[in-house]
From Swiss-Prot:
Its EC number is 2.3.2.27. One of its GO terms (biological process) is protein ubiquitination. It catalyses: S-ubiquitinyl-[E2 ubiquitin-conjugating enzyme]-L-cysteine + [acceptor protein]-L-lysine = [E2 ubiquitin-conjugating enzyme]-L-cysteine + N(6)-ubiquitinyl-[acceptor protein]-L-lysine. SUPFAM superfamilies: Ankyrin repeat, RING/U-box. It comes from the Eukaryota. This is Probable E3 ubiquitin-protein ligase XBOS32. ANK repeats lie at residues 50-79, 83-112, 117-147, 180-209, 223-252. GO terms for molecular function: transferase activity; zinc ion binding.
Length: 496
């Protein structure tokens, strides 16, 4: 009888859980809040078979407010779906930078890799060309220091790396490898994502990293290929020039003995003949990426320590932010000393596309003075750190509505208790981007739908067209893992 009771409660939770999934997918914040107030354990609900949580649905659709709500309810931020993907990977895949920013503020694990391809959030962002997401994922590795770009550009400088720069940690992060030895730079170069290539190179991505034959891949370009080989296959001249300017070798050969020029010819990239046939006579001038954004680390640290959203409202704001005129000032820009609310400073760092001298600084919206870092204003109180709710769901049972007289939830401590005139309007989410490679006519993607959004296994090249001229790994038939940029494995959509 007790077992039947548990089963009955489980089915009751399933109905509420499906409602939460629908609310997370559709962006219904009020419905999601009401369901979580009724039963906070629903935050850990996962759909049958697909094992996709409400957090994955909200992240894939770009509903950053629902993502915040779920995290404040105590859901595990690094929860995986059936492919081993975290919410951070989903947000990076679809380019939802606001969701990425929210997850990074809650300290999402950026080192997690998925089960199918061994790719991290950086790989997903680079593959789909989302430079802003890529930069947010690396927020804790790029210090707010004025000479950062010059230090990274001239790694052989006699001065050596700055004490504030963890050069080894940044190098390992930017050059982490997925299955087959693929780095984020390989993926961005193949698809011609110039902004991602430029940013990765500025952050220390290696141009000599080569792919490997790991027994689980079908590599149509060839094992031992550098990012320049992949750029030659993709056919983007600017990507090739950027890589050559950073020291990529034109004579490097992969395991098949092909140079980048030979790869370009085999893929009929005739426009690259002149670029790849001879070394440039003079050094190619490089400019810093507009996404470098040096103040990002400082404002992210301040937001985590002091909070970035506001609960209490007041009819009159004392010292309001000059940008939004709603939140009270909590941070100041180093240099010009102009003050902003933390949320506006976060938005400024995440969306600024204009870079001023020194490289990576962003212009102050009030005086255009370069901003390299932000500092917290004196008197700003840190938020209290409370243990997060345990939401174990061995059997998720329905529970009565929360008493209005109960103690405040952890959500109330994630906001600064300062005054505010009106609620900040929600920031718009970027739209989904096409997963197809426009410059590779032989490459097609067959989108399958999962979690209410496109969740195509990020693979680019259809293999059946090439016949026996490309060698297939002997172990491919025994392994279900495939290198994502070079094969496609359609997965049927799951319900709800």
């Amino acid at each position: 009888m007790g077992f039947l009771s548990l089963v009955g409660n489980s089915f009751g939770c399933s109905a509420s859980g499906e409602r939460l999934v629908s609310a997370a997918r559709d962006g219904d914040l009020q419905e999601a809040r009401a369901l979580l107030e009724y039963n906070p354990r629903l935050a850990r609900y996962s759909t049958f078979g697909g094992r996709n949580s409400p957090l994955h649905y909200a992240a894939a659709q770009g509903h950053h407010e629902i993502v915040s709500l779920l995290l404040e309810s105590g859901v595990e931020i690094n929860l995986r779906n059936y492919r081993g993907q975290t919410a951070l990977m989903q947000a990076c895949q679809y380019g939802h930078w606001e969701v990425v920013q929210t997850l990074m503020l809650f300290n999402a694990n950026v080192h997690r890799t998925d089960y199918l391809n061994g790719g991290s959030a950086l790989h997903f962002a680079a593959l789909h060309g989302h430079a802003r997401c890529l930069r947010l994922v690396l927020a804790d590795y790029v210090p707010s220091m004025p000479n950062f770009w010059n230090s990274m550009k001239d790694s052989l400088s006699e001065e050596g790396p700055s004490a504030d720069l963890d050069e080894d940690g940044l190098f390992k992060m930017v050059n982490q490898k997925a299955d087959g030895g693929l780095t984020p730079l390989h993926m961005a170069a193949l698809n011609g994502h110039v902004e991602c290539v430029q940013l990765l190179l500025d952050l220390g991505a290696s141009v000599i990293e080569a792919t490997i034959e790991d027994g689980t891949t079908i590599d149509l370009i060839g094992a031992g290929s550098t990012p320049l080989h992949y750029a030659a296959c993709g056919g983007n001249a600017v990507c090739c020039q950027l890589l050559i300017a950073r020291g990529a070798s034109l004579s490097a050969q992969n395991a098949s003995g092909w140079t980048p020029l030979m790869v370009a010819r085999s893929w009929h990239r005739n426009s690259l003949e002149e670029i790849l046939s001879k070394e440039p006579e003079s050094r190619i001038r490089t400019v810093p990426s507009p996404y470098l954004c040096l103040p990002l680390m400082s404002i992210m640290s301040i937001a985590r320590e002091f909070g970035w959203r506001y609960l209490n409202q007041s009819p009159v704001c004392i010292d309001p932010c000059a940008v939004c005129l709603e939140g009270s000032c909590s941070v100041a820009a180093e240099g010009c000393k102009h003050e902003f609310c933390t949320r506006c400073a976060l938005y400024l760092c995440s969306t600024s596309y204009t870079s001023v001298s020194p490289a990576g600084a962003i212009p102050c919206p009030l005086c255009r003075h370069p901003i390299i870092a932000f500092t917290a204003l004196p008197g700003t109180s840190p938020i209290r750190e409370l243990p997060r709710n345990s939401l174990s769901l061995s059997f998720c049972t329905t529970c009565p509505a929360v008493n209005s007289d109960s103690t405040p939830s952890i959500a109330s401590h994630l906001y600064r208790t300062e005054f505010q005139c009106a609620r900040m309007p929600p920031m718009g989410s970027s739209s989904f981007r096409s997963l197809s490679c426009q410059r590779l006519p032989a490459m097609k993607l067959n989108p399958s739908f999962c979690m209410g959004a496109m969740d195509t296994n990020p693979c680019l090249i259809r293999c059946s067209r090439f016949g026996p001229s490309f060698r297939r790994s002997a172990s491919q038939g025994e392994s279900s893992r495939r290198a994502w940029p070079l094969t496609f494995d359609p997965i049927a959509a799951t319900g709800s």
